[in-house]
């Protein structure tokens, strides 16, 4: 990322300029399709009810969560619950074999989509602006993929939820008119505070703890953006994005096999649910 920032400085580009000056012209149309798919996945998830497939017997929550948000008087809490309901909606669609966008993976598909949905339908941000935000988020996701991993089986959940939170924080920072260094700072914060997160899905399903982690992840992305926006005016960040990505890779290599998508340890072994065999 440091090299990309240097190119941007040299050419007086922002991250959007960098992406579209280095990618095929069809990328914009592709990202437009991605945005549409994200928005539709939230819509479907908010309208669906019933039990998620598999042995866990988990009820869908997104619809009721969204309806509950409408009765919350505290604006701050209403915002949080509403945004989390969007993340639940997409993650529950994924758990039900619905069409979602891997951003960057299925296990973390609800974070960026939830934020895009909120900004489009609740905040009235234009499609063009959101497509540009996807380009920025995707840039950070690709750096993670190239220099480390986005696979829970390789790096634990820090590589999935952590990367998705990072991409969303970067997109959010762009949408809030933060500069290049502030965007990098937001992405770094988002990844740094997911370091060491294990991947231990109960029963092997992308349900527990995955769905709830998407809801928490989108809130963390907003927090990372906000912290960057104001802390960057107080002090210079000591840890840069490249450093935290290298650290994530190292941490993932040190995580035991039991905590990297195998369901052989962690919550997958501790949570007892009827129909799930821990042997």
Question: What kind of region is each of these model predictions?
Answer:
Residues 35, 80, 84, 134, ...:
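Hydrophobic faces of stable alpha-helices that mediate helix-helix packing
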Residues 85-197:
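Glycine-rich anion/phosphate-binding loop at the beta-strand->alpha-helix junction
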Residues 172-279:
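Functionally critical mobile loop/hinge segments
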Residues 74, 78, 103-106, 128, ...:
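Alpha-helix capping and helix-loop boundary segments enriched in small/acidic/polar residues
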